[in-house]
């Protein structure tokens, strides 16, 4: 279990699907959650011993069936695969996380709903207003806005993002304004700073200015957009060339 524990420690807020032979196994609290969501058998490994731990798994060829169920239930999932042929391995088989899937960042056809956007939303709350950025990773559609809480709430209700990214300092403020019925991920406060956001926007779009996106006079929207790009990198979604711009909403309606 040392290899498992080492990998799990790097992804503590995910359900880790750990490839063992022809199965993906889950352990401990992950196994309890997976068994409940997937309606699979929950057993114990090392029953009665000091190393006793909950266990639940499914055949590897059923990943496309079970992964969508986990994600749609609001869970983040880390898929840990065998990185070498077990028959050729000298000692312990090398394993590593090959994919991270969150409720708001998916590209799997089995998870995506036809003709429906699948947004992750970043919310930057301040006493003077709220910045918002929304990204559909499957299409590259990237949008931003800033304004009072009422307008931001209208956009959220219209576009129904699957996951919120929040500054951990202001999670309570956001929940009070917009509710808490959407899966949330909290990020460190330094992610939500203008200079850091501008670095990410410049890196993503190869530009030294925000003028082409209308963000030069929208600092709250800029910060929210930067947090989304940071999150993509944080969970190792590095294929972002299809995200080619960011549309700033300036109208009281996201569809005007």
Name each model feature, range by range:
Residues 1-251, 255:
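Charged catalytic and DNA/RNA-contacting regions of genome-maintenance
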């Amino acid at each position: 279990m040392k290899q498992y524990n080492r990998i799990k420690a790097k992804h503590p807020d995910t359900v880790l699907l750990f490839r063992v032979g022809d199965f993906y196994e889950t352990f401990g609290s992950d196994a309890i959650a997976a068994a409940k969501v997937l309606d699979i058998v929950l057993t114990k490994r090392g029953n009665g011993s000091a190393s006793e731990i909950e266990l639940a798994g499914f055949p590897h060829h059923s990943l496309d069936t079970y992964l969508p169920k986990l994600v749609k239930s609001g869970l983040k999932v880390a898929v840990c695969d065998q990185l070498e042929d077990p028959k050729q391995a000298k000692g312990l088989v090398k394993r590593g996380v090959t994919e991270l899937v969150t409720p708001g960042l998916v590209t799997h056809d089995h998870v995506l709903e036809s003709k429906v956007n699948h947004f992750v939303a970043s919310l930057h709350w301040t006493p003077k207003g709220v910045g918002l950025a929304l990204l559909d990773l499957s299409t590259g559609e990237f949008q931003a806005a800033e304004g009072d809480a009422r307008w931001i709430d209208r956009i959220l209700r219209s576009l129904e993002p699957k996951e919120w990214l929040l500054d951990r300092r202001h999670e309570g403020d956001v929940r009070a304004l917009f509710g808490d019925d959407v899966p949330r991920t909290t990020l460190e406060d330094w992610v939500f700073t203008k200079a850091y956001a501008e670095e990410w926007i410049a890196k993503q779009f190869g530009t030294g200015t925000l003028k082409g996106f209308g963000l030069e006079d929208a600092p709250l929207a800029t910060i929210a957009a930067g947090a989304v790009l940071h999150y993509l990198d944080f969970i190792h979604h590095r294929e972002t060339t299809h995200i080619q711009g960011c549309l700033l909403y300036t109208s009281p309606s996201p569809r005007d």
